[in-house]
Curated annotation (Swiss-Prot):
This is Protein LAS1. The keyword Mitochondrion applies. Keywords: Mitochondrion, Nucleus. It is found in: Nucleus; Mitochondrion. Disulfide bonds: none annotated. GO terms for molecular function: endonuclease activity. PANTHER family: RIBOSOMAL BIOGENESIS PROTEIN LAS1L. Residues 469-489 are annotated as: Disordered. It comes from Saccharomyces cerevisiae (strain ATCC 204508 / S288c). Belongs to the LAS1 family. Regulates cell surface growth, bud formation and morphogenesis. May act indirectly by regulating factor(s) involved in these processes. One of its GO terms (biological process) is cleavage in ITS2 between 5.8S rRNA and LSU-rRNA of tricistronic rRNA transcript (SSU-rRNA, 5.8S rRNA, LSU-rRNA). The gene is LAS1. It comes from the Eukaryota.
Length: 502
């Protein structure tokens, strides 16, 4: 359950009003309320800056820079004035830093381009931030105006017009028929439609995903320096565009498809919908793509698999999606579990150990036992094959790997006492039916009688074996008591002889 959060606005209606002030529905609005929106955000800040979300504050700061630019333009001041450029640069730098700094939670610094790719922020914002911070000359005014407009558009798409806000508002106004938004069933239908289109597009682009792996395997985008914004390379732009038009178009389509997956995954209430759709159309390549590009997809998919596996093991009359796609344990192990484990990032596994530990505790099974054993072996292999200078550095620091390995070993010991390879035979024994819930077959009385006879014979045989074992133990104990215990003594007049000679 998500804990409640203190916000400076009274209700969602007030936030909706602020949104309309920042982003009027029509540009020809008679009364421009952007200045009033900036003032309202300033009043929110007086209530406590810790309660004000960064995206709201950043929207106000960028809008303030835009208003200052428009004001000086109306007064006829020189267009390339330093105060306006500094105002734009500072607002954009704070915009980027406020988005990326909270995601910098690793033990070692992660490149900002990687963090930007995870949240869907275009990489050129990172380069513009670097240019405004470290370069000798500030970016041009036209470039800054365009960047501010793009930043406001990004904030609108990822926050102000986010469906999660609509979900929260609809929860409060569930019985309201005023025409705002659409009901949850309609949302699910539209979500499923978008999910189906995204999946179909991925199927069409599968060959491109195989050919241009570097686009989705490496989150780092190519750096853009200040020369990219100066216009010096525009002379050869058409030639370069014709030369690599196919590659650039494929790269664009791949990035667009990844962005669609990320937008769908942002709504946590539909995670199970995405996972069910994914497993109904299972592809190892798509699994790798989503694990590398969707936040928390790795442990979410393991959690879904573990729950499906336990449901299948607990009730043999139910055929889960997992059983229909992977009928035998070896198939499940090679085509799914090993793919997940091989593509699981060890650093992410350590950083999010709390999530993994909770998953292991709540979904105990032989599948989780296999997962723990494989991850322990993977972590130990990484420790052996790591670079020497990294190992020296790790010795000086408190490394959480030792603690995680100890907990994994403890979980393995506990799970080994409860589960064994007999679960594999049970999983293989259950047939994969087409129907999700097959009908129970009635057993004939004759078959019941035969079964009871067999079970009775087995019980009597077990009793005889146990009684025979107790008798054998008693006989051995009596023999041991009958034979006296003698101490070792040296043999007198012993002469060594060759083997075979008496």
């Amino acid at each position: 359950m998500i804990p409640p959060r203190i916000v400076p606005w009274r209700d969602f209606a007030e936030l909706e009003e602020l949104k309309l002030w920042f982003y009027p529905k029509s540009k020809g609005t008679i009364e421009d309320k952007r200045q009033r929106a900036v003032q309202r955000v300033q009043s929110y800040r007086l209530k406590g800056s810790q309660y004000l979300p960064h995206v709201v504050d950043s929207t106000a700061q960028i809008t303030c820079a835009v208003l200052l630019d428009e004001k000086e333009a109306c007064l006829g001041v020189h267009q390339d004035s330093i105060p306006i450029r500094l105002s734009y640069v500072m607002a954009l730098i704070r915009f980027v830093n406020g988005l990326l700094d909270p995601t910098q939670q690793s033990q070692f610094a992660i490149p900002l381009h990687t963090l930007a790719a995870k949240i869907g922020l275009p990489s050129w914002f990172v380069d513009l931030r670097h240019w405004g911070t470290h370069e000798r000359d500030l970016p041009g005014l036209e470039m800054l105006r365009w960047a501010a407009n793009e930043a406001l558009s990004w904030l609108y798409d990822h926050y102000w017009n986010d469906e999660e806000l609509e979900d929260d508002r609809d929860d409060d106004d569930d019985d309201d028929d005023t025409g705002y938004g659409y009901r949850r069933n309609d949302k699910l239908e539209k979500y499923m439609e978008s999910l189906t289109k995204t999946l179909d597009k991925w199927k069409r682009l599968r060959n491109e995903f195989l050919e241009y792996k570097w686009v989705w395997e490496n989150a780092n985008d190519s750096l853009i320096t200040s020369s990219n914004f100066s216009g010096d390379n525009l002379v050869n732009y058409d030639a370069e565009k014709r030369k690599s038009s196919h590659a650039s178009s494929s790269e664009t389509m791949i990035r667009e498809n990844l962005r669609q997956w990320q937008e769908l995954w942002k709504l946590s209430i539909y995670h199970n919908v995405v996972l069910e759709k994914f497993f109904n159309n299972y592809d190892p390549l798509l699994l790798k793509v989503l694990m590398l590009n969707l936040n928390n997809f790795d442990w979410k998919v393991i959690e879904w698999v573990a729950r499906n596996y336990r449901t299948q093991q607990d009730d043999s009359n139910i055929t889960t999606i997992l059983k229909r796609k992977f009928n035998a344990w070896k198939e499940l192990q090679k085509r799914l579990l090993d793919v997940i484990i091989n593509n699981l990032n060890n650093k992410n596994f350590k950083n999010k150990w709390q999530n993994w530990e909770k998953l292991i505790d709540e979904n105990a099974s032989y599948l989780i036992l296999y997962f723990c054993q494989s991850m322990l072996a993977k972590l130990e292999t990484e420790k052996i094959t790591g670079n020497s200078w990294r190992n020296k550095k790790r010795r000086k620091q408190i490394d959480s790997t030792v603690e995680i390995e100890a907990k994994l070993k403890e979980n393995i010991d506990n799970l080994s006492l409860r589960f064994n390879e007999g679960e594999i035979k049970l999983y293989d024994f259950i047939p994969a039916e087409k129907d999700s819930v097959p009908l129970k077959k009635e057993v004939s009385p004759a078959l019941k009688a035969d079964t009871n006879d067999i079970l009775g014979d087995l019980a009597s045989l077990k009793q005889r074996m146990s009684s025979f074992g107790t008798v054998g133990k008693k006989n051995k104990q009596e023999e041991n008591r009958a034979t006296p215990v003698k101490n070792w003594s040296r043999v007198q007049n012993w002469k060594p002889k060759p083997f075979g000679v008496l």
